[in-house]
Amino acid sequence: MLNDKAIRQSKIIYWSSGIVSICGIIFEVLFGALGSYILGDGVKQYTLTISLFLTGMGIGASLSEKFMRNLIIKFVWIEFCVALIGGFSSFIMFGITAFAPAGTDAFYLYSITLIIGALTGVELPILIRKANEIGVTLNKSTARVLFSDYAGGLIGGVLFVFLFRPYFGMVKTAFLVGLINLTVALIVLWLFRKEIRHFIVHAVIGGVIGVLLIAGLFFGEEMAFNFEQKLYQDPIIHMEESSYQKITVTQDEKDIRLYLDGSLQFSSVDEHRYHEVLVHPAMANVETPENVLILGGGDGIAAKEVLKYQDVKQVTLVDLDPAVVELANENRHLLEINEGALMDEKVEVKNMDAFQFLEDTSEWYDVILVDLPDPNNESLNKLYTKEFYSLVRNHLKPEGTLMVQATSPVFAREVYWTISETISSTNLNTENLHVDVPSFGNWGFVMASREEIDLDIMEIPVSTRFLTDDMMPALTAFGKDEDQQIPNFELKANTLIDPHLIQIYEKAWENY
């Protein structure tokens, strides 16, 4: 039968187990998010970080067999290490990305993931042994510590998704979680102080770590911002981290640029070239374009071009991230570019997944414009599949027209023609177009309809800055190094079952 002191100590151990588990899972998913943002390909990065973290836990658990005495002070020092290393992890990652040679950031991220995983793996066996040492039977100590650990894992994941990432960002989150680890260590240190030699020395060291973490919490994000500025050619004037992505706006004199997770979305100097080709051939191919659907395009620029047509009665814009739409409606630089298009009474904005929207809606559209980010992760890749384009076709009126941004036929030749082949596989007639956009390079589009498309007779009935009637046929001319005749490459449709486009995309862009 446990006495009151042993009961109190065992409760401390169980609570400590749950809290450090919360911290561990937050660090685990934080490293995945860091890898996804900085290195790209979210599925790959989350897979690697989770695997490395679990491997580290296994290594730590194996090493813990050597820890049989002085368990509390060993636990305290493990928490000190997790707090310091984990707390500064995001801050250092941004610094390495800005200043170190290519590849160093990946090596650092994977190393830090393994180290934090190993430290986390040591914690549980120590706590189980300590609970057993104070009188709790082994079966009870194991069950209760593991219960606290697993329950903490769920709580940590939920907290990261709904609290830490959207409200604190990656740098502050790491420092905050490090402070939580440190707090657990200091509480345990105090409550078990009678068992610990040189208590004051350990407490002072913990205090120093606390000062460093608090300094990082208040000043680290600003310094990391300066690191991140090195990744952009122009000064950053706006940066936020939404629930879905990091949104960055830069300015150099009159050049306003929007980046999502570090990928350029447009430059105000030449965006008209991109958006006019995206919008006007499709709109001009329909006699009376009354009902228009835009998938993506949360910056509002495509909507601005669509609203030039007097026949348009309804524009539905579907963009997953409400933060992008909010920025487009409130930032004075973006408002100047999109002319407040998203606030027009004809425009209805829906913040939801494009795939889900098409599954749910019963509407038919005269024109559908697909202005989505490139297929650089699994979530986006599904929006470049035969299944997705089949849904698009099913909501296209018989005489309607589809236009899809399809990456670069020069830099990502195989990607561009795979997207074209995928759209063709839905029994739509396609026309391939491309245009030079200085900030992007040569950029490609795929136009599709149930009817034959003839750009030779097409006329644009609205004002433009770049595109003319005479130019439209020229958009379909591809050079030998960018056409469909790709040596040693088999074109096949991208599907949900065989999502090979993402691998093609990674390979195409790895040198750019």
From Swiss-Prot:
The protein's matches in Pfam families, at most eight in alphabetical order, are given as: Spermine_synth
One of the entry's Gene Ontology molecular-function terms is:
thermospermine synthase activity
Residues annotated for spermidine binding in this entry: 275, 299
- Output a single Gene Ontology CC term carried by this record: plasma membrane
| The protein's annotated pathway | Amine and polyamine biosynthesis; spermidine biosynthesis; spermidine from putrescine: step 1/1
Identify the stretch(es) annotated as Spermidine synthase.
Answer: 217-457
CDD domains in UniProt: AdoMet_MTases
Q: What is this protein called?
A: Polyamine aminopropyltransferase
The reaction(s) catalysed by this protein are:
S-adenosyl 3-(methylsulfanyl)propylamine + putrescine = S-methyl-5'-thioadenosine + spermidine + H(+)
Give the residues annotated as coiled coil: none
Subunit annotation: Homodimer or homotetramer.
PABS domain location is 215-450
| Stated role | Catalyzes the irreversible transfer of a propylamine group from the amino donor S-adenosylmethioninamine (decarboxy-AdoMet) to putrescine (1,4-diaminobutane) to yield spermidine.
